Amino acid sequence: MRIILSWFLVFGLILIGHGQTATILSKEGKVPLESVLLHSENPNIQGITNKNGQVDLSPFMSAEKIDIRYLGYKPIIESYLSIKEKKFIIYLEEAGITLDEMVISATRWQESSKGIPSKIRTISKSDMQLLQPQTAADLLGISGEVSVQKSQQGGGSPMIRGFATNRLLYVIDGVRMNTAIFRAGNIQNVISLDPFTIEKAEVIFGPGSVMYGSDAIGGVMNFQTTTPKLAIDKKWVAHSAVNSRYSSANREKTMNGTLHLGSPKFASVTSYSFNRFGDLKMGKYGPDSYLRTFYVDQIENMDKIVQNINPRVQVPSGYYQQNVVQKLLYKPNEKWAFQYGFHYSGTTAYSRYDRLIEVNISGVPISAVWDYGPQIWQMNHITVSHLGKNAFYDGLTLRMAHQYFEESRIDRNFSGSNRYRLRTQVEKVNALSINIDLKKTLKKGILYYGLESVGNKVSSQATAKNIQTEAPILVADRYPQARWNSYAIFGNYQYPFSKKYIAQLGIRYNLFNMEADFSRNLAFFPFAFKTTNIQNGAFSGNAGLVISPDDKTKISLNAATGFRAPNVDDMGKLFDFVSGEVVVPNIDLTAEIAYNGEINLSKLIGNSLKIDLTGYYTYLQNAMVRRATTVEGKDSILYNGKMSKTYSIQNAAFAEIYGFHAGFELDLPLGFYLSSRYNVQIGKEELNNGATTNSRHAAPAFGLSTLGYKKGKIHLQFYSVYSASVSYENLNEEERQKPAIYAIDENGKPYSPSWYTLNMKGMFTVFKSSTLNIGLENLTNQRYRTYSSGIVAPGFNAIIGFFVLI
């Protein structure tokens, strides 16, 4: 019966289309494939299939070579005439394991990974549909190659190759998300992205500054979100989808609805998601020091220490979030495309859990209140694309974007002079960016080049009040009022010496400047300056070589530099990172520079085994680090009601990171498969006295191993995630000062224990257009913290989700 229905579907699709409409199906199940990419160099045009696997081939009538690619399937090359002879029905065969996939991160253009010397990890839509990550931070974690730190449940700060926070770059639909207030401390901006709207995520490891600019030192995380789908027939089509999910560990309730509308030239997609995350429950078996035995609550207008009825429930850690995405596409012909995108993300306030569990020497909580206010991100984004052969380019993409960021911090001490002072610090950033990306195929090789302009306006305001009298209290702003600008020109040339050797060479020059006004804080601190202007520039470059002795072997060598320009957070921030110690502004900063070398080996053995090996070394020069300083000749100032020792961010250190990645994928008979990924990163950074300590953001060795089964309507995975320990002796010097987030060893010293989880996920096609997801995470109910995290990871977690396509 299934075979008969499949063939009825095939013939039905043929009848729906017209003579020049091709239908692309999977060879195994005869299922239509959506978002298959078709590309021709002559004529220079592209096409993409709709949800019925259909694409209009009339623009390809003169094409002798049409490259047809789809993630997870073997690429094929056909001519228009050969497709016509097949009556416009094309079958794609599942690739299983391959060295070739389409990526966009390396050059900002979609291309085959075969000619790219950098290591890139792709997280596909099918991975996300099976594993059901709650947030975009969790999405990165399922890669098995990115370690994620969480200070609180509403968190997620990736660590890649020993770097994190503002030494990593986030890119959404080709637009940089990093702003002038991305800090060296852990950040959680990535949770603003909605996993339901992410079509694909790519992580490029190592410096990516040539194509992406400042901050791309440890890596670049490139997220491609949902796009509108055009219709093939000369009429409007519509379809919608609904996702729902429940998770037991935090009583998550998530709903998503998506609506697609399309005609041959105009299309729209609308998506809305709502997440309700309750207080997170930790596991049963693990260190007792992780238990949440108390919390602070106000009872009759007095702060009270309340005994937690269930110490495994982390109170308070829950929050709500909603996301909206709206995109419009107008494509008048095969050469031009105009797209508008709108993104909105907003959370409720959520507690910074790692601060709420801190106690003083007497065991009394330090904070009564420590919350992040609502985190808001909004982006308006216009993209203009043109395909056409001329003297300057074969392809051009213009991106213009405006982003608005809002974040806040709300804190009050449990005791002392500030126990009644409720302080609120609000930061707002307006970011404008323009990117022009061009691609030109030359007689020998391809040139990728472009221009970038980025501007940030930072507004910072702090207020406080006495909670008993409501009287206002004057407090210092976190940042000066500031502007940060960056202008760049770049180029990257890919030259094939032969089929076996491909070289790549790139260069970028970046000019940046920063203006800051400290007037609002002069009443609090005797700075010797009122305003400041910093201007500097930086070159970056890369050189790579890909060697392919045969179709089943890829060896790549890559050398690259990266840089991070000082931003407003580095230069102008005023905050207390530890009680009694405060960071003050420094107007003499310059860019830090990274030098990286790596070697990658990918090898197919037969048609069923793939091995990946990578080794790398990175040296960071002029690293911006926290160092002791003086203000008006004094080493301490009065801040937050107490005399505090002064520090500033300075170009005063070096750091070095080295490590390796090893992984394999194995196809087994009867639909089974096996894979494993393991990562080791070792880092050193210079201390104030010239000695070194282990790098704060070099996570302990970690990995992911998976046994899966995929056949027909069933996809199952049993997998384990695991991490090595970090002893007190190997713990970063700064991390040693945070005993609240670490376990205690037999000598009474903080350390990070090793841990593992066992997990199961299943996805079942219940009907033709609906799927059921079932998951069981942390089956052995381990109580563990990922490295450097404040929140304890979930204990046993049962997940059920349902997807319906209408």
Residue ranges and their predicted role:
Residues S498-K499, L511-F512, Y616-Y619, Y639-E733, ...:
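Gram-negative outer-membrane beta-barrel transporters
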Residues V55-S58, M177-P207:
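Short acidic/polar hinge/loop motifs at secondary-structure boundaries
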Residues T348, V359, Y404-S408, A464, ...:
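Surface-exposed extracellular loop regions of Gram-negative outer-membrane beta-barrel proteins
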Residues I90-Y91, S192-A241:
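A beta-strand signature from Gram-negative outer-membrane beta-barrel systems
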Residues E28-G29, V36-E41, R69-Y73, E85-Q129, ...:
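Short, acidic, small-residue-rich periplasmic hinge/interaction motif at the N-terminus
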Residues I3, K331-S345, P374-A523, K530, ...:
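Face-selective signature of the C-terminal outer-membrane beta-barrel domain
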Residues N250-F277, P287-Y350, I376-Q378, F497, ...:
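Transmembrane beta-barrel wall of Gram-negative outer-membrane proteins
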Residues Q425-D437, S486-A488, V584-T590, N596, ...:
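Outer membrane beta-barrel strand-and-loop segments of large Gram-negative receptors
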